[in-house]
Amino acid sequence: MGKIRKLDDQLSNLIAAGEVVERPASVVKELVENSIDANSTSIEIHLEEAGLSKIRIIDNGDGIAEEDCIVAFERHATSKIKDENDLFRIRTLGFRGEALPSIASVSELELITSTGDAPGTHLSIKGGDIIKQEKTASRKGTDITVQNLFFNTPARLKYMKTIHTELGNITDIVYRIAMSHPEVSLKLFHNEKKLLHTSGNGDVRQVLASIYSIQVAKKLIPIEAESLDFTIKGYVTLPEVTRASRNYMSTIVNGRYVRNFVLMKAIQQGYHTLLPIGRYPIGFLSIEMDPMLVDVNVHPAKLEVRFSKEQELLKLIEETLQSAFKKIQLIPDAGVTTKKKEKDESVQEQFKFEHTKPRESSMPNIVLPTGMDEKQEETTTVKQPAQLWQPPKQEWQPPQSLVREEQSWQPSSKPETVREEKEWTSNDDDFELEELEEEVGEIEEIEMNGNDLPPLYPIGQMHGTYIFAQNDNGLYMIDQHAAQERINYEYFRDKVGRVTQEVQELLVPYRIDLSLTEFLRVEEQLEELKKVGLFLEQFGHQSFIVRSHPTWFPKGQETEIIDEMMEQVVKLKKVDIKKLREEAAIMMSCKASIKANQYLTNDQIFALLEELRTTTNPYTCPHGRPILVHHSTYELEKMFKRVM
């Protein structure tokens, strides 16, 4: 007898379940997606012990006909595709026909379903074996219960995490599905306690508000773009609202939540230098495209996809986000906690500014000595001395703050997570949703005022680190190092992008010794390094020498810049000339900028603020830290109880 044998269906289902049903969250995902494919508009999810004891999904969808109930639990049985052509034009969430038999093979499953045209069907399955099938009275839709998950696979059960962790995985999946399909009302219960309820009215802002809070929803800006192949819609937070994890970014492709690192990277690139290192935005991006352009048949879990025009999509995402941020002022409000203000037309009046357009990048003309004393005379190229600013004689109108209650960005030591349980305090569902709709409806669109910085008039300096300035719109606090870092960065970024013939010879050639692997890596990229003005000559078997450098290299930092470029070339799998220039410009701008505890004269402060206004992004340094924080006059009045 031969050694190779065909496995029976039950064993095959157990093997398939290892990929499809990894944990309770996998069961919830597959069953809820089936409900959505069945045109459900309302879905209830009931859990006990984070789904390990019981998972129950109730929907009002199309239901399953009696003759299809048994077939639905056979391997690769599906109503969603018929031939290989359908496989490349998938519009549904499910299509493989693996989920139901896999779930049934590792649990005790009970199904009650009806199409509404005939009596319902009651089906009981244990470990893949059909125990009972009978007709029953049932409303239209499907009610499916999964109990004792992994009862017959103790090895899999042993690797389950704590109840809290498994519940977190489930809520994370349900949140993503809720964002993907705001037109479907979702209710999530755990041990009879309600964790989530969405209205199903199609407004994704309400879903985002119910998941992340009204305060976060107020800091969202809409994103929308369209090309020949792609349509993008969504919301992302202002740069001041960040989290310590990428888990707050959700990407949806043709209604399907997917985990795709390159899409998340594109969102981050869209923020460019607006985000601090190690911080990530909250974002929801829905992408619609021809199914022929995306392959969803990559993994049984259907969370991974491949794009046939990936680079075009990534470029569209980056450009769309960058364009959106250029249209708004990104000065974070310091904010004070206030009660919900009355709607006052005077409060809602926004100050308008007329600014000069940023001029072509040039090296900042502020002359600052490395060591400075308050009593020393300093040199500055400002033609007119700064004078204390006198406010115009006019009746003050408090400006509108985007969100009074929101605090400016602060790195939180305990960031909130998507997996945090949320309990709804009201027992009246309609009241809860009406209240949420009202709050979301009151969220005002963030005004697109352009990216110009209003004129600022210095009034002082604190600890040789922070500059205080004012204008009609209130008080501004500026980080002087971050401000000049932004000025220098835009200067060096422009210079690094040019290959100039003007070079400075080194008195002693700089020698770079590398390992053989590093040497070969750098040797491959010699032409790329020339594009940033760095010319290397081979010297021996594993070394290079540099005899000259561009004249714009900051004096005394030549070798550090060369070493930084070498490190980037060795570290990156594929050298990106744009990133190489970026890293070099960031490093040079940081080292060339004034530091903390360095006192400036009024003229130097005024010159610094004027230079800052000429930059294309005066709101964050190249590392993403905020340059300035705004206290509106209205907020200051509130702090001192001058207005109520």
From Swiss-Prot:
Gene Ontology CC terms, in alphabetical order: mismatch repair complex
Annotated region (Disordered), positions in chain: 340-425
Cysteines engaged in disulfide bonds, as pairs: none
Biased composition (Basic and acidic residues): 340-360, 416-425
Compositionally biased spans, kind Low complexity: 387-400
Statement: the UniProt record of this protein carries the keyword Nucleotide-binding: no
Keywords associated with the record: DNA damage, DNA repair
One Gene Ontology biological process: mismatch repair
GO MF terms held by the record: ATP binding; ATP hydrolysis activity; ATP-dependent DNA damage sensor activity; mismatched DNA binding
Keyword Oxidoreductase: no
InterPro entries documented for this protein: DNA_mismatch_repair_CS, DNA_mismatch_repair_MutL, DNA_mismatch_S5_2-like, HATPase_C_sf, MutL/Mlh/PMS, MutL/Mlh/Pms-like, MutL_C, MutL_C_dimsub
Cross-referenced PANTHER family: DNA MISMATCH REPAIR PROTEIN MLH, PMS, MUTL (PTHR10073), DNA MISMATCH REPAIR PROTEIN MLH1 (PTHR10073:SF12)
Similarity section: Belongs to the DNA mismatch repair MutL/HexB family.
Function: This protein is involved in the repair of mismatches in DNA. It is required for dam-dependent methyl-directed DNA mismatch repair. May act as a 'molecular matchmaker', a protein that promotes the formation of a stable complex between two or more DNA-binding proteins in an ATP-dependent manner without itself being part of a final effector complex.
Name of the protein in question: DNA mismatch repair protein MutL
